């Protein structure tokens, strides 16, 4: 065994001072001193349990001792009689065995492959033991779940990721998917439960047993987000539901994840074989599938962007040449050829890598370099995590932990270790780029003329700039030179390292050459330099623009077209990553795919890290807004589609925010008990105004109200029991908080809940019955107008149907025409007096006479006036389709409806484009005169003369 290095020998004295007397007095072996010096986790554990150290000294860890884990744990659980006892014993067993694994790993008593096997088998043993104990307990409590033939149904657990592959980290969370075979109900219990309810409740208890922190710690952090539909999907699915999902909706990234899926525990039973056979066709295609390369390339791009966003420098998992790239290399061959080559269908990386070499898919040299690099990186990762039992892949910056790792990895010092690490990661990166790297060869632009470099370096006299700036006016030339000079002065005020200066000196001549070729060079340069000032200390973003000429080109064209986009990029430079791929930049997410894209995006963030979750939501929204705006500018999205995309994006955000708030509230209080025997959450979010009418703009806020169907006597079922209606109030407050909290990425949306019954004076969340009663007996006409543009944007089917029925009933009430006309007209006149244009000789597109609001009032009036006779008028909540309905139902002549639709979309289009230019929503008084005259005539016809 290698002696401790000098820094570690000094640290040993600190360790001695921490040890209790029985250990301090004891003559510790050299092995014990080494491990206690290396790992604070082992130190803390043996201080709390000195007998573990005695056991380690007398029974040194062996490579094959994982075979005894199940028997050892069974003995530990033999006297457990309740869930609290189960939780305690599982935690103590996990910690004891992890100390043994850390001991063996630190001293290199066993191979790294054996360490990975032990870590994975320990997790599986604990998961299966907890499941089996809880299954028996739940069957005693609720009866045994059976299928139609009366056969008992088990809970099957898929271990995903490294757990499934038998390659678990030292300190890792576990990704699981729960499934049961067939529908049916319980037998032998006090009352019948269907299997879905039984397994959902059992699954919740299993997660609690493994995941909930106690004074003994936790067993594993459990992540269930890889299941179908993610957090919004059922916790446990039947085989049939799983099969339907993966056949109909399974995404490429889910196929990638499923490669490593392994059934925990008895994997040879009938049901296990059935589940495995069902999933295999989804993962391994019968044909050779080269489309997977682009999918994996896209996923790697997402990871690279995440590394930049979160500043994950020195990350041996996600960085270039890291563990993830080796995994991608191996899985590319599995996904492309696994359907034809059964030998590639292994879940574990190293055996699969050997098969890849044997099939000559990679050269023996490349495969061997990857194998050696993988074992090196995994040992480094596990040692790093075993210092504090902490889930990290980022190399330490402090001297002590660097000395620890250098010693444990058998290097003289930190520079020697990092030198070897760099060599391994360089080898991995080379193979990765050859296989999965961008398929377009990066061509170097022709070298720029020396004059552009001199212009940037301020080496040109003003007269010398004439050739490169000759096409610009004298004023623009002076402005460009001033902007360059001012930018250089700003740089002098900032701390930019040598690498940053080097990248800037390469980037700026290219940038100036492209910008100054434009007629609007001065304006564009002013926007871009404002952005660059914000990122000059973040070299990775400068490198992005320097190394990807296409990204620089898109940056220039978008900043030239829209100061709003320039401002967004300056405020949130992480959006620069979106410029890398024009296929996605100018092609917004499909309207029905926002929820799934967001779900995939959030999977990269720890579920229990609220701060990162909030940031991720905001970053996703900003990236999607950029793509929508880019497509808008490029003319590929008409105004109606812009609003559709903005609305679908908002709905995806609402879905995710409600999900996060729900998880947080249930963790604190439990669920309201009226939900125990039904699906869903008993909660709905209703969108009003632009959201309800599918008419959101770039900076629109969200008008929301919250409904629940909780009975008066309901209580929550958690340890901190509260009134059920109080639960929904706190849920709504939490939702508002998640939307409105300002992080470094800003707020998510401004949310206005004042359209709820009784406005700001009313309860934030309302029961469905109280909402219906208010609308029937207390609401004003303007509130019924608002209801025309309202719809459920999140909610259970029952609540959605209830709201739709109330809305339809209210809109179909018989109304006296003259009275309604007067009330609507007077409300509009009040609004105009309050909100109308205060700018002389300007037309406010939304608020002034002949503008958008007049059109909205016309449609609302006509729906309320005629829905009693024409119920079909209640179908839609957006103005364009309401105008279509008015024509189809012979309320309005088709010619007038089409003309109002054209006027409406024209005015909204102008508002979108003014927003992109960061201009207020008013224009010269002589603009849109034809549209305004048309709207005025229609207003006169319906709301004055009739």
From Swiss-Prot:
Highest taxon in the source lineage: Bacteria
Alphabetized InterPro entries for the sequence: GlnE, GlnE_rpt_dom, NT_sf, PII_UdlTrfase/GS_AdlTrfase
Keywords of the record: ATP-binding, Magnesium, Multifunctional enzyme, Nucleotide-binding, Nucleotidyltransferase, Transferase
Cofactor(s) recorded in Swiss-Prot or TrEMBL: Mg(2+)
A GO term, aspect molecular function: ATP binding
Family matches, as HAMAP family: GlnE (MF_00802)
Annotated family: Belongs to the GlnE family.
Name the UniProt record assigns to this protein: Bifunctional glutamine synthetase adenylyltransferase/adenylyl-removing enzyme
């Amino acid at each position: 065994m290698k002696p401790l290095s000098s820094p570690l020998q000094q640290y040993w004295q600190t360790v001695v001072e921490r040890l209790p007397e029985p250990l301090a007095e004891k003559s510790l072996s050299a092995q014990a001193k080494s491990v206690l010096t290396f790992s604070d986790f082992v130190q803390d554990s043996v201080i709390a349990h000195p007998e573990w150290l005695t056991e380690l000294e007398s029974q040194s860890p062996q490579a094959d001792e994982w075979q005894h884990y199940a028997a050892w744990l069974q003995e530990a659980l033999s006297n457990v009689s309740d869930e609290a006892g189960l939780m305690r014993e599982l935690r103590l067993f996990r910690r004891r065995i992890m100390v043994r694994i850390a001991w063996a790993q630190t001293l290199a008593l066993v191979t790294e492959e054996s360490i990975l096997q032990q870590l994975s088998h320990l997790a599986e043993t604990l998961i299966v033991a907890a499941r089996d104990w809880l299954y028996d307990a739940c069957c005693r409590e609720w009866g045994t779940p059976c299928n139609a033939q009366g056969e008992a149904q088990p809970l099957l657990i898929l271990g995903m990721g490294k757990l499934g592959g038998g390659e678990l980290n030292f300190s890792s969370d576990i990704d699981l998917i729960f499934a049961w075979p067939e529908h049916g109900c319980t037998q032998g219990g006090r009352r019948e439960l269907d299997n879905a309810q039984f397994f959902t409740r059992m699954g919740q208890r299993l997660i609690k047993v493994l995941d909930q922190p106690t004074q003994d710690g936790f067993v594993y952090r459990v992540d269930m987000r890889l299941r179908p539909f993610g957090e919004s999907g059922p916790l446990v699915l039947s085989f049939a539901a799983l099969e339907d999902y993966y056949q109909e909706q399974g995404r490429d990234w889910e196929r990638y994840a499923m490669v490593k899926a392994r059934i925990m525990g008895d994997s040879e039973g009938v049901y296990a074989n059935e589940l495995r056979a069902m999933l295999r066709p989804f993962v391994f295609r019968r044909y050779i599938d080269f489309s997977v390369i682009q999918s994996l390339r896209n996923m790697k791009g997402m990871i690279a962007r995440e590394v930049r966003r979160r500043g994950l420098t020195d990350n041996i998992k996600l960085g270039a040449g890291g563990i993830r790239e080796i995994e991608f290399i191996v899985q590319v061959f599995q996904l492309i050829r696994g359907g034809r080559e059964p030998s590639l269908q292994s879940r574990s990386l190293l055996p699969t890598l050997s098969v890849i070499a044997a099939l000559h898919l990679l050269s023996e040299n490349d495969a061997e370099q990857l194998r050696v690099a993988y074992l090196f990186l995994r040992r480094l990762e596990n040692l790093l995590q075993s210092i504090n039992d902490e889930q990290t892949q980022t190399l330490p910056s402090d001297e002590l932990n660097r000395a620890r790792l250098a010693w444990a990895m058998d290097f003289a010092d930190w520079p020697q270790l990092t030198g070897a690490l760099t060599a391994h990661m360089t080898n991995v990166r080379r193979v990765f780029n050859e296989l999965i790297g961008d398929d377009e060869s990066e061509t170097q632009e022709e070298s720029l003329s020396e004059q552009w470099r001199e212009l940037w370096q301020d080496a040109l006299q003003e007269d010398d700039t004439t050739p490169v700036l000759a096409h610009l006016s004298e004023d623009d030339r002076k402005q460009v030179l001033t902007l360059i000079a001012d930018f250089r002065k700003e740089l002098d005020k900032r701390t930019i390292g040598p690498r940053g200066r080097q990248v800037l000196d390469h980037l700026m001549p290219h940038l100036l050459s492209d910008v100054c070729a434009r007629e609007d060079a001065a304006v564009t340069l002013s926007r871009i330099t404002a952005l660059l000032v914000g990122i000059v200390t973040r070299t990775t973003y400068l490198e992005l623009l320097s190394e990807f000429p296409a990204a620089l080109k898109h940056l220039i064209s978008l900043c030239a077209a829209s100061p709003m986009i320039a401002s967004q990029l300056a405020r949130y430079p992480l959006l620069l990553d979106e410029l890398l791929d024009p296929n996605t930049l100018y092609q917004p997410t499909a309207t029905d795919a926002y929820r799934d894209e967001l779900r995939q995006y959030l999977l990269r963030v720890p579920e229990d890290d609220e701060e990162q979750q909030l940031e991720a939501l905001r970053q996703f929204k900003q990236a999607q807004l950029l793509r929508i705006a880019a497509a808008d500018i490029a003319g590929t999205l008409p105004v109606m589609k812009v609003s559709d995309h903005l609305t679908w994006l908002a709905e995806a955000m609402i879905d995710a925010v409600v999900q996060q708030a729900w998880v947080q509230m249930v963790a604190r209080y439990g669920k309201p008990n009226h939900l125990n025997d039904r699906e869903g959450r008993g909660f709905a979010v209703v969108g009003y105004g632009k959201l309800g009418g599918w008419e959101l703009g770039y900076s629109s806020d969200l008008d929301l109200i919250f409904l629940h169907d909780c009975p008066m006597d309901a209580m929550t079922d958690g340890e901190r029991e509260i009134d059920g209606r109080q639960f929904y109030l706190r849920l709504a407050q939490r939702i508002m908080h998640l939307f409105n909290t300002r992080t470094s990425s800003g707020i998510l949306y401004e949310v206005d809940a004042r359209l709820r019954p009784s406005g700001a004076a009313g309860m934030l969340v309302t029961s469905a019955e109280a909402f219906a009663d208010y609308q029937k007996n207390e609401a004003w006409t303007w509130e019924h107008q608002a209801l025309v543009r309202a719809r459920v944007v999140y909610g259970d089917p029952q609540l959605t149907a209830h709201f739709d029925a109330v809305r339809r009933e209210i809109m179909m009430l018989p109304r006296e025409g003259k009275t309604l006309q007067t009330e609507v007209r007077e409300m509009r006149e009040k609004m105009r007096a309050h909100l109308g244009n205060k700018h002389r000789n300007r037309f406010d597109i939304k608020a002034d006479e002949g503008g958008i609001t007049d059109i909205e009032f016309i449609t609302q009036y006509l729906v309320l006036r005629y829905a009693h006779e024409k119920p079909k008028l209640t179908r839609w909540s957006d103005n364009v389709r309401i105008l279509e309905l008015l024509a189809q139902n012979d309320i309005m002549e088709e010619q007038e409806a089409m003309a109002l639709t054209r006027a409406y979309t024209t005015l909204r289009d102008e508002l979108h484009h003014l927003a992109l230019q960061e201009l207020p929503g008013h224009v010269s008084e002589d603009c849109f005169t034809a549209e305004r005259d048309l709207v005025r005539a229609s207003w006169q016809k319906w709301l004055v003369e009739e």
